[in-house]
């Protein structure tokens, strides 16, 4: 996620410019620093395994609150302030993204690997292309938080770059741009 206001403004202007040039941007955002900040305030542990946030039930609540509530709405508002017609959703909305729990492969000092359970961390199994295409056909700029759900309705934390790649692949996108501050 972007922290600096001038970068946020520039990003929003660039996204709206792409739209007016006939390109159909879809935004998938992360929010690691903001999630960490709220976890610290709540005195909940922040732990990663090979770049994946260990996500228990309380952490998943914070992840979804920060990504789908706070940050998604801020990004939508910023793009809309530039006449962008953005619409915020999460991967859970309309079953945009279905996922399954992902275990992370970790090697010990001897090179032996094992699968580690990192909680409610998922890998995408399906993208709802019809929903995405309908949002694009409605001339909106979808702004998507990387929270998906499994077949039982359990919220899963998805790496934003992974979600963006899955969406780009599902839509046969010509370009995938990964942006970070």
PLM feature spans:
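Nucleotide/pyrophosphate-binding catalytic subdomain
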Residues: 1-180
């Amino acid at each position: 996620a972007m922290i600096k206001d001038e970068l946020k403004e520039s990003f929003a202007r660039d996204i709206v410019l792409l739209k007016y040039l006939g390109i159909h941007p879809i935004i998938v955002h992360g929010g690691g620093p903001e999630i960490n900040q709220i976890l610290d305030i709540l005195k909940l542990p922040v732990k990663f395994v090979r770049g994946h946030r260990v996500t228990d039930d309380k952490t998943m609540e914070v992840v979804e609150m920060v990504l789908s509530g706070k940050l998604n709405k801020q990004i939508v508002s910023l793009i809309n302030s530039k006449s962008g017609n953005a619409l915020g959703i999460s991967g859970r909305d309309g079953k945009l993204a279905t996922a399954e729990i992902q275990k992370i492969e970790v090697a010990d000092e001897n090179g032996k690997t094992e699968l580690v359970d990192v909680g409610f961390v998922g890998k995408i199994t399906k993208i709802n292309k019809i929903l995405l295409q309908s949002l694009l056909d409605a001339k909106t700029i979808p702004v998507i938080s990387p929270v998906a759900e499994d077949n039982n309705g359990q919220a899963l934390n998805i790496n934003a770059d992974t979600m963006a790649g899955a969406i780009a692949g599902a839509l046969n996108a010509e370009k995938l741009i990964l942006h970070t501050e």
